Amino acid sequence: MAFEEVRPYTPGDEVRFIDWNVTARAGDPHVKVFQEERELRLLVLLDDSASQSFAGDAEAKIRTGAHAAVALAAAATRGGDRAGLLTFDDKVRTRIPLRSGPGHLLRLARAALSCRGEGRGTDLVPPIEEATRTMAGGGIVAICSDFQCDGWLEALRRLGRRCEVLLLPIMDPAEVAPPPVGLVRVQDPESGASQLIDMSSPGVREAWESAALGRQQELLATARSIGGDVVPLRTDQDAIDAIERHYQRRARGRQT
């Protein structure tokens, strides 16, 4: 039980909860009110599809996602809460149930860090639907992905009615602002389709950057529409730092 507030005594309140110091100052009985502490449950969905294997000059996107997944789970289990993991590509591949403790965290970390981005195409619907069933009693669902698929918004809305949702889009700098390196053959790792693009053209790079910005803004709007949050992750930056900064901003916002 966690202390919440002190309020005037009303008939039916337990005498053992009377705050005698406040009662003496106020001149009439006051009681302490407690709120039941609920165990936090965190489920991380980690995208292990082929697009996650992309790596420019930094580490592969799946490495960044795996590090974020482990960091989130470590923060939860450190406080005695439960954490779980689903890895997926076009379907759920690995399931680590919701548990706590250092041994469980080690098992979860091994599962996350063993991902190589070698799966098939991306489908967010199966893991989101499984998360909705698993987390029916509420909790936090964090999704680490590059979100390179369509058709999952309605499933996310259903999840958002039950849980707090955290979207962690993973981006490589070259995907956001490609360097002017001339002709580049760009290949979709999931479909195999490729296209020759002239990255030395300012117009091409501007269109590319505009499209990347548009995807980021769309994802932010999606999260806000369900009361969720977005923590952008970049492969050339520390994922743990990004997550810590997010929660520090949230804590400051609650204090104002």
Question: Could you tell me what each predicted segment is?
Answer:
Residues E5-D13, V22, V31-V70, A74-T256:
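Exposed, interaction-prone extracellular/peripheral surfaces
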